[in-house]
Curated annotation (Swiss-Prot):
EC category: oxidoreductase
Lineage: Eukaryota, Viridiplantae, Streptophyta, Embryophyta, Tracheophyta
Keywords, comma-separated and alphabetical: Apoplast, Copper, Lignin degradation, Metal-binding, Oxidoreductase, Repeat, Secreted
Residue positions binding Cu cation 3: H69, H373, H430
Name of the protein: Putative laccase-16
Its job: Lignin degradation and detoxification of lignin-derived products.
Domain of life: Eukaryota
Annotated positions binding Cu cation 2: H24, H67, H432
Gene3D superfamilies: Cupredoxins - blue copper proteins
Pfam family, one: Cu-oxidase_2
Amino acid sequence: MDRKGIVLGSKLAVFSMILLWHRHGVDQPRNPWSDGPEFITQCPIRPCGNFTYQVILFEEEGTLWWHAHSDFDRATVHGAIVIHPKHGTTFPFNKPDKEIPIILSEWWNDDVENVLDEAKRTGGDQGNTYLLRVINTGLTNDMFFAVAGHCLTVVSIDARYTKPLTVDYIMIAPGQTMDVLLEANRTLGSNSRYYMAARAFITLPVDTIPFNNSTATAIVEYTDSPTARPPGPPEFPLLLPAIKDEDAAMAFVDERMLIDIDVNFLPCDTTNATNKLCKGPQGNQFAASLNNVSFESPAIDVLDAYYYGSGRGVYEEDFPNKPVNAFVNPTGDNGGRPLLTKRGTKVKVVEYGTVVEVVFQDLSSENHPMHLHGFAFYVVGRGSGTFDERRDPATYNLVDPPFQNTVSVPKSSWAAIRFRADNPGVWFMHCHFDRHVVWGMDTVFIVKDGKTPQAQMLPRPPNMPEC
């Protein structure tokens, strides 16, 4: 187990910016104090203040990432974390000749003044194998990614090794990381330049929200090509899915939860003409929910309230194991599902060591990348339509399921995960589309202390930011 102390300071006083720092996919054993989400495990770092994060690495190995965790700050405040094998060990596959981090993100027109039209290249030699560490840091979209003329072999997801899978393209959700091997196996004398391309995947009608569906590209160029032959135009990935290609997107348990994921509305005070939030249908406010509960951030962080035993009035320990208003048989339009929701700061409390199964049921018209802090989980099942608790568990993969910290749940579909609650503390679970986090598509798991000192949460650091 490695422990690192890293000081984060907010010196942007002129912009009155507040900062929070989350290491996405780092489990932080017994140490929720340094996890980072705003008003869940700490209060914000105010301008000109600082806070020392204690980063604890345990079993993670591979590619993770870090980002701000307050509103939309992570649109630009993010970066890669690469955790190499321990000394004396190596990858569970042939060592690549080179490693290349690739960060996929979104371009926000409101934040930039000039756009430079330039292509950035990376050179490679024929016969070499390259490990591409792909990270989707975007706020709103799953991304397709491919390299023309080459296959990709997925060897790790969210810093956990997986059974190698060779594909023409990958689909990566916001918040996810994937390590993929690229073999530079084109024949000598063929084209020496190939496009590396990324394209967003959306399920909403394109005319619903103005959207630039352009494809981001970079150029992979072989450096050992005969100099006598001038380089031709790069080849484009022919198998990169279209922007709305939905087909391409597509034990023992102590605690079972069925969680409906939905985008809905909150009643709004339409008599207040200055209320800018009342922009939804019939003057309602846009919201999002888990099990018909739209999470409301408290005035003080949940972790402090739990630690001091003062949770009363801050949160309620009655997050439902099943939807409050169940909706059966979701279809493409999901007509008839409950559209109004209610606010609440409801959390789920579990005993240390509990094996938890969560089935996410997507009722909305878009995908949702669901992320759990403090844990990695097994993705044991997926399916389209309504989850059938009698039939569908028989289809679970309990032999070699992927081990991840973010799972993408397609629209009108379900995904089942399992994890052991062996990390005491307060842990945020949320959709990684930031607008949905702000709207309330989140909740909190509180894992109680175990009986031994090694199974108990670490003491509160003395320099935690004040609310």
